[in-house]
């Protein structure tokens, strides 16, 4: 779709109003959730998304790149492999340690810093590019997070995002989890970051252009049951969901997840190949 332009560059600061107690509490629960399990087992399978996002941004050697809600560092490593000066941030220390170990194994020089996506500890316009793959979309205060991404990006710089869409496989998985463990009232779905309308709402005041292209990532597992077992063991949000339910609830959740996979599975040999739509987004400030 053709990009649109906007004359206004400086957005209003949504952080002028302190976050509500509910959002603060939710962030604490999210942090505990992402700290549980071992996200790297799942996260590293998504590496190709980080590589493709770096190509979409056309990153150049020497550019200063900030990865926000970096997890175990997929796009962090992808940018560093292109000789960028990368700073990798997350509010979960164990995830940063995973990224640091991966960088060390490849001999990549990367700065790692614990940071909240809604209150980034960097100066205005400090980075040529700001990136996040399936990370910043989970922030409770979406407006504040978008403001922070724009704030630390230099004028004319780029923000690159990969966000799951509401109707894709992971977006539908979110809806199933929400049926069993409803989010607090008023909390917006992270999958809204995968819609053009929401991107326009939270980024347009400070962006000169927004380009969003649908892409697909294929989840490949030994079987639908294998996917559920891996995610309930290593993916914090699903691990916490199963742990919070009684046996009846766990069986219902497992049944609904298997049914969702069956409805989308491209494999006919007992394995699982399920494409999940996401938006690859390039925002120019």
Where are these regions (language model features)?
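N-terminal acidic, proline/glycine-rich, low-complexity intrinsically disordered segments
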Residues: 1-10
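Conserved class I S-adenosyl-L-methionine
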Residues: 9-11, 15-63, 74, 98, ...
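Class I SAM-dependent methyltransferase SAM/SAH-binding core
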Residues: 64-119, 144
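A short acidic, Gly/Pro-enriched loop at the edge of an enzyme's catalytic core
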Residues: 118-129
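A short SAM/SAH-binding and catalytic strip from SAM-dependent methyltransferases
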Residues: 129-142
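Conserved catalytic/acceptor-binding region of the Class I
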Residues: 143-144, 150, 154-223, 238, ...
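Conserved Class I S-adenosyl-L-methionine
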Residues: 191-285
């Amino acid at each position: 779709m053709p990009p649109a332009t906007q004359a206004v560059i400086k957005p209003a600061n949504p952080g002028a109003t302190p976050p509500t107690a509910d959002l603060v509490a939710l962030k604490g629960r999210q942090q505990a959730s992402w700290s549980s399990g071992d996200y790297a087992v799942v996260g590293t399978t998504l590496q190709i998304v980080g590589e493709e996002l770096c190509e979409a941004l056309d990153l150049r050697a020497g550019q200063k790149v900030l990865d926000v809600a970096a997890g175990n560092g997929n796009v962090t490593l992808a940018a560093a492999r292109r000789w960028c000066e990368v700073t990798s941030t997350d509010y979960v220390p164990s995830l940063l340690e995973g990224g640091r170990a991966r960088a060390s194994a490849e001999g990549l020089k990367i700065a790692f810093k614990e940071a909240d996506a809604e209150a980034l500890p960097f100066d205005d316009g400090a980075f040529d590019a700001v990136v996040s793959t399936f990370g910043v979309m989970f922030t409770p205060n979406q407006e504040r997070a978008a403001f922070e991404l724009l704030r630390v990006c230099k004028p004319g710089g780029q923000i690159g995002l990969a966000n799951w869409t509401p109707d894709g496989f992971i977006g539908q998985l979110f809806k199933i989890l929400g049926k069993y463990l409803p989010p607090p009232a008023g909390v917006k779905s992270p999958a809204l970051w995968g819609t053009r309308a929401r991107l326009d709402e939270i980024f347009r005041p400070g962006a000169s252009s927004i380009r969003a292209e649908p892409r697909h990532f294929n989840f490949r597992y030994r079987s639908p049951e294998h996917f559920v077992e891996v995610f309930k063991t290593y993916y914090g949000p699903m691990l916490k969901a199963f742990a919070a339910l009684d046996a009846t609830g766990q069986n219902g959740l497992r049944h609904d997840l298997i049914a969702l996979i069956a409805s989308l599975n491209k494999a006919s040999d007992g394995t699982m190949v399920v494409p999940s739509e996401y938006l690859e987004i390039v925002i120019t400030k």
